[in-house]
């Protein structure tokens, strides 16, 4: 029974939950108070009507707008204000359901969606001020009314692109002192009027041609921008906000970086910070790349440099999207007219198009008129393009590469590989020329005070020129921990969990720890996690500069996902020992032939397969194995580019896509076996193996493990299966000489157990299995890397006893945000997050997991089924159970006939190409809860299915594309518990 609740640190979900409890009278009844903010403050900031009234009361301008609660009223208001209009639903996250409408048709569509997604059924319709500058202020206020600004930030993209999808610069670069002070005063007035205690983020639109501005919105909580502002300044916003909520004032809270100043000092920046979004279009080839007021980015990178050009170049190469400079996307085939039109397109490639326009001699005015991007930024991009020209001139023999030119290229952070490519020399030659002329990276501190006071726990960024501030600290052994870079589909926050826990364990073992990472959203980039933090891109050159200065005794790559693994070879060339499993053993697990030899030696079966390089070889392999086959590139994470092929056409299509993503590694073709998928994370000390638990995927093989519902402990496998899995895990861990972690995926087909994949590193299930078994896997693996054994650490080797409850990990998808993406599941990962349901019974755990993932049924009790011919028999039983819990079933012709023939009442609906009312009318009519759509495999897939699934997601209908998921969902509906039991996961710790 808590005394108080702090809702401002849990994002929009925290605020919404606090408001629902407040509205239901729960806090009053239980005598619990909200701290950090009041319910009235949240309402004033989040309720669009109250926000407008509050701003008008203190004379702060807002764009002309009105609140609507139905589509008809919305269209009337839009007419009155005049198109284009911006639509913003109340109480939603990341601009969900919002957008810019240029005409009544678009307006009606966005309104319908926005009203459905808003918790209170409200949408704000306002004048569109797209093209104005978007500026943000991060402000702090304590209970005594003291206020400071922590940081101000500027979006390179003008208003109209969600700040989460925009390139953001801190501090703002294009404001004059008058504008800066005007907005600062406004932000301090707003936070004081709203009565916020803690952190708050205010977003402004500023007219570039006058001093006119208006307030876009206020987040009365710690937000994504707060995380960026914290990392950009070194001022720990969330920590200070929590202390303020407990009653401290700003002048009582010490600055943790300097240990001398207080939180009432405004941070000073003597450097430039750039944030770039990491967008998921590499996973969703069909998605619309345009950016608007709904956020699409899955993550972000941040870089720091003494100049904007350098910070931008660092951010570009931190994205890990095969881009390293402004030449990375090629627009040379566009005519000048087309290029000018394309500058209008707001998407993730826009700065590369601007660079191309500058190469062709477009004037700054031409570019500014179309993009509304400030002249200052266009000029900085021009400086980068001029350097390209200078380096190309060296390549063509017109100039020679002088030390001055090289020093200037490095000052604006041109990496050696790009300089080598443009000048036609080798990277080694460039590096030698640099070193001979003393052109080396030096490291500067982020110390919150522009070097006014000494810093106790600074972090570092590199630049060229000046003196080095990263001093040698202690005489202890040093370990370099490589982070996992930006959050993207397939490599999420799970790897940051591993990096942080391993850093702490190394510290406890007496090591000096050094983290390299570039993601402002993560815990690993907090200044107090490691002894030293370098905020740098994770590329061989950037890491080598750190190694030159720090000279670590070893590096650990098994906790940072594929990002860290990819740096293994480069680290070994630098002479840095890889701690834990040896690099050649990691290679053996990825190299098909070596791995097959190990399996043969251990007498472990795997699905038959071949390694190929061309489409012809792939088809030949598929004919030998017999379709269906699984085709995938080697060395990828998150199943990128993986597909189930059922014909030669599928293979041709697949190889075409692979060639787009520059494939130098071979392609693997495997026989596809339909069975239960099992996953194990284990720790090995070279002799003994510890297996915390066995997880089972609800979806059968063919759906990526990251998109499957995962159950611990595994439910329906035999003791014989379990013994085989444990035996194979032990044999493989020993054969690969694993020291630390290993992740293995199996297929169970009756009594047979096959190996699908082995990764001698941490995996995305590590935090889940650690939390639900109470076994601290990462600290144990780290201590084993340091030389301890499993027995020494007090654990009995082998499979640990299963818990007496069930824990289910449910994937969470963001399909409604990513327009045009196909939502059907397959071997390529698509989920952007996950949640956990824990209970004493399987059914209750499943129900909690579905609820947690936001799948809340039923509302209308109507559903649509469209199942491919081969699965229709299996679908009958599932349909019968949905009918038994009260569902009315509509189905496409073939499915409806099968269901009716088997005694399940189903109403036949017309296909998409038939006249209305057809399946699409039913979906768009807002009467359907659920669609079960099992698409045909491979090239047989119909475009109709894609259109229906997309429209369903965009109108808020739950869509399942796997019968196993449908079976799980109906099971949870059959067993809906009135009262959910609580399980305190902290009590199960074995640690």
Q: Model-predicted segments: where are they?
A:
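ATP-dependent carboxylate activation and anion-phosphoryl transfer catalytic cores
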Residues: 1-2, 13-15, 27, 58-59, ...
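Internal, active-site/partner-interface "lid" segment
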Residues: 33, 66-71, 254-256, 262-274, ...
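Acidic/histidine-enriched active-site and ligand-binding environments that engage anionic O-linkages
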Residues: 76-85, 620-629
């Amino acid at each position: 029974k808590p005394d108080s609740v702090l809702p401002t640190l849990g994002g929009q979900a925290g605020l919404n939950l606090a408001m629902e409890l407040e509205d239901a009278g729960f806090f009053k009844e239980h005598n619990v108070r909200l701290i950090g903010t009041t319910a009235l403050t949240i309402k004033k900031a989040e309720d669009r009507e109250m926000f407008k009234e509050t701003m008008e009361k203190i004379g702060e301008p807002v764009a002309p707008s009105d609140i609507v609660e139905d589509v008809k009223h919305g269209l009337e208001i839009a007419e009155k204000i005049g198109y284009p209009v911006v639509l913003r639903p109340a109480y939603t996250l990341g601009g969900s359901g919002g957008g810019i409408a240029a005409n009544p048709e678009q307006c009606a569509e966005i309104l319908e969606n926005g009203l459905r997604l808003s918790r209170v059924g409200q949408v704000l319709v306002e004048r569109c001020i797209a093209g104005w500058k978007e500026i943000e202020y991060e402000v702090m206020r304590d209970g005594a009314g003291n206020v400071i600004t922590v940081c101000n930030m500027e979006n390179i993209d003008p208003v109209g692109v969600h700040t989460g999808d925009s390139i953001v610069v801190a501090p703002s670069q294009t404001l004059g002192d008058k504008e800066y002070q005007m907005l600062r005063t406004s932000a301090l007035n707003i936070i004081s009027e709203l009565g916020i205690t803690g952190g708050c983020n205010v977003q402004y639109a500023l007219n570039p041609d006058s001093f006119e501005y208006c307030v876009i919105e206020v987040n009365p909580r710690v937000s994504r921008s707060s995380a960026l502002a914290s990392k950009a300044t070194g001022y720990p916003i969330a920590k200070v906000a929590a202390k303020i909520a407990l009653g401290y004032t700003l002048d009582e809270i010490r600055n943790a970086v300097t240990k001398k100043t207080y939180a009432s000092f405004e941070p000073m920046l003597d450097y430039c910070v750039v944030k770039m979004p990491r967008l998921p279009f590499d996973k969703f080839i069909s998605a619309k790349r345009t950016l608007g007021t709904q956020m699409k980015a899955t993550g972000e990178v941040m870089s720091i440099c003494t100049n904007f050009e350098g910070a931008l170049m660092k951010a570009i190469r931190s994205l890990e999207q095969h881009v390293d400079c402004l030449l990375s996307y090629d627009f040379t085939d566009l005519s000048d007219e087309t290029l000018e039109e394309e500058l209008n397109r707001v998407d993730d490639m826009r700065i590369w198009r601007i660079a191309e326009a500058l190469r062709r001699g477009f004037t700054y005015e031409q570019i500014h008129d179309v993009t509304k991007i400030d002249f200052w930024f266009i000029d900085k991009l021009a400086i980068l393009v001029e350097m390209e020209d200078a380096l190309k001139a060296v390549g063509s023999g017109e100039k020679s590469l002088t030390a001055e030119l090289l020093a200037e290229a490095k000052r604006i952070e041109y990496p050696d590989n790009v300089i080598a490519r443009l000048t036609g020399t080798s990277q080694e030659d460039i590096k030698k020329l640099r070193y001979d002329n003393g052109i080396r990276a030096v490291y500067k501190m982020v110390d919150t005070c522009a070097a006014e006071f000494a810093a106790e726990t600074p972090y570092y960024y590199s630049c060229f020129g000046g003196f080095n501030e990263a001093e040698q600290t202690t005489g202890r052994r040093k370990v370099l921990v490589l982070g996992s870079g930006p959050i993207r589909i397939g490599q999420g926050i799970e790897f940051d969990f591993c990096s942080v826990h391993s850093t702490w364990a190394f510290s406890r073992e007496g090591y000096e720890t050094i983290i390299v990472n570039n993601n402002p959203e993560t815990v690993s980039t907090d200044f107090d996690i490691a002894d030293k933090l370098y905020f740098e891109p994770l590329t061989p050159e950037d890491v080598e500069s750190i190694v030159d200065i720090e000279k670590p005794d070893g590096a650990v790559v098994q906790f940072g996902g594929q990002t860290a693994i990819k740096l293994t070879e480069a680290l070994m060339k630098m002479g840095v020992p890889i701690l834990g499993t040896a690099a050649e053993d990691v290679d053996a697990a990825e190299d098909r032939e070596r791995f097959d030899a190990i399996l043969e030696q251990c007498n472990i079966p795997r699905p038959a397969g071949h390694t190929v390089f061309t489409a012809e070889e792939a088809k030949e392999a598929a004919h030998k194995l017999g379709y269906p086959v699984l085709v995938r590139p080697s060395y990828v994470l998150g199943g990128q580019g993986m597909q189930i092929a059922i014909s030669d056409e599928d293979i041709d299509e697949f190889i075409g896509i692979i060639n787009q993503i520059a494939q130098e590694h071979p392609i693997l073709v495997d026989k596809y076996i339909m069975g239960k998928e099992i996953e194990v994370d284990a720790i090995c000390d070279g002799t003994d193996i510890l297996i915390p638990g066995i997880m089972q995927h609800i979806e059968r093989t063919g759906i990526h493990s990251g998109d499957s519902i995962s159950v611990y402990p595994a439910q329906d496998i035999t003791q014989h299966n379990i013994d085989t899995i444990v035996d194979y895990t032990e044999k493989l861990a020993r054969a690969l000489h694993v020291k630390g972690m290993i992740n293995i995926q199996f297929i169970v087909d009756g009594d047979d157990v096959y190996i699908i994949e082995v990764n001698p590193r941490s995996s995305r299930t590590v935090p889940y299995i650690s939390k639900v078994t109470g076994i601290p896997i990462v600290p144990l693996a780290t201590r084993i890397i340091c030389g301890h054994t499993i027995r020494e650490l007090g654990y009995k080797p082998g499979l640990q006893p299963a818990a007496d409850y069930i824990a289910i990990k449910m994937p969470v998808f963001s399909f409604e945000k990513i327009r045009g993406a196909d939502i059907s599941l397959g071997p390529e990962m698509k989920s952007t997050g996950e949640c956990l349901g824990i209970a004493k019974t399987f059914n209750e755990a499943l129900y909690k997991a579905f609820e947690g993932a936001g799948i809340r049924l039923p509302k209308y009790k109507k559903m649509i089924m469209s199942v491919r011919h081969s699965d229709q028999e299996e679908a009958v039983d599932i349909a019968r159970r949905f009918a038994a819990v009260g569902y009315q079933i509509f189905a496409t012709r073939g499915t409806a006939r099968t269901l009716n023939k088997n005694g399940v009442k189903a109403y036949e609906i017309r296909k998409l190409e038939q006249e209305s009312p057809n399946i699409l009318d039913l979906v768009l009519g807002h009467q359907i809860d659920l669609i079960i759509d099992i698409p045909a495999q491979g090239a047989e897939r119909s475009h109709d299915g894609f259109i229906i699934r997309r429209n369903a997601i965009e109108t808020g209908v739950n869509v399942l594309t796997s019968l196993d998921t449908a079976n799980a969902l109906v099971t949870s509906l059959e067993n809906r518990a009135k009262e959910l039991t609580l399980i305190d996961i902290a009590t199960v710790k074995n640690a």
